[in-house]
């Protein structure tokens, strides 16, 4: 977390300019609210890849759940896959067995799954279902899911090793549209950064969209007209925003 002070300083400069901050993520609202509180950050939240939108005060502005019949089919069907299944609702993250390796991405927040019998999961409040595993295996699973669900759900890769089943029409871009309407803003006024296919709609709809250097090749192929900045490990977003604040009229180089 050595880069955290620099990133927080950049975000503080944006707030001083009265620029509205929004974190759009596949992560759970409970985790993100904890992180924002720990860092004393004021920002809107788009979580669960668009399934929830929260205000600065934590008020729920928008929600989108999987239809109960879709959740039931995904949970009860025997899929030909080695991937692990993960279910999300407002109470947290649930899965059927311990997978300690998955918790490495949540070391900072301490957010973790709860072990349950997935077939006893309440079906009426599921926000999304994720499958985590090998990309080739998930690609085959995507075909199975599409054949079973058709147009009743939105499937997307939020990472090469994570395939998500989301409500129809649910994505970060759609959620950002809801938020901008709530704030009386235009998508043309927005700047966004992303690296995976769950960022596609958002990056394609805002006035200034930027693809990370570590992005999935599929995202670059879908949005070839968008500029590519540096790698996330080099704090490329903070680097770009600092340049934008200091030299708004000069061309940017990630070097």
Swiss-Prot record:
Its cofactor is Mg(2+). Its EC number is 3.6.1.-. Keywords: Hydrolase, Magnesium, Metal-binding. Mg(2+) binds at residue 195. It holds the Pfam family Hydrolase_3. CDD domains: HAD_Pase. InterPro entries: Cof (IPR000150), HAD-like_sf (IPR036412), HAD-SF_hydro_IIB (IPR006379), HAD_sf (IPR023214). GO terms for molecular function: magnesium ion binding; phosphatase activity. Gene3D superfamilies: 3.30.1240.10, HAD superfamily/HAD-like. PROSITE patterns: COF_2. Catalyzes the hydrolysis of 4-amino-2-methyl-5-hydroxymethylpyrimidine pyrophosphate (HMP-PP) to 4-amino-2-methyl-5-hydroxymethylpyrimidine phosphate (HMP-P). Belongs to the HAD-like hydrolase superfamily. Cof family. This is HMP-PP phosphatase.
């Amino acid at each position: 977390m050595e880069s955290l002070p620099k990133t927080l300083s950049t975000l503080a400069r944006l707030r001083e300019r009265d620029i509205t901050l929004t974190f759009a993520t596949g992560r759970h609202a409970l985790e993100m609210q904890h992180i924002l509180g720990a860092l004393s950050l004021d920002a809107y939240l788009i979580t669960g890849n668009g399934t929830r939108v929260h205000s600065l005060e934590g008020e729920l502005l928008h929600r989108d759940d999987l239809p109960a019949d879709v959740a039931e089919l995904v949970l009860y069907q025997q899929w030909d896959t080695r991937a692990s299944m993960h279910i999300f609702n407002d109470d947290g993250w649930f899965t059927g067995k311990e997978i300690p390796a998955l918790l490495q991405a949540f070391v900072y927040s301490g957010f973790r799954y709860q072990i349950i019998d997935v077939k006893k999961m309440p079906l009426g409040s599921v926000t999304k279902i994720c499958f985590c595993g090998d990309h080739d295996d998930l690609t085959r699973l995507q075909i199975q899911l599409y054949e079973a669900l058709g147009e009743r759900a939105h499937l997307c890769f939020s990472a090469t090793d994570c395939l998500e089943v989301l409500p129809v029409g649910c994505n970060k871009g759609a959620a950002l549209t809801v938020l901008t309407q709530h704030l009386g803003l235009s998508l043309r006024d927005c700047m966004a950064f992303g690296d995976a296919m769950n960022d596609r709609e958002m990056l394609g709809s805002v006035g200034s969209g930027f693809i990370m250097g570590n992005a999935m090749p599929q995202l670059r192929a879908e949005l070839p007209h968008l500029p590519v900045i540096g790698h996330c490990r080099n704090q490329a977003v903070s680097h770009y925003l600092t340049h934008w604040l200091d030299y708004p009229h000069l061309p940017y180089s990630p070097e």
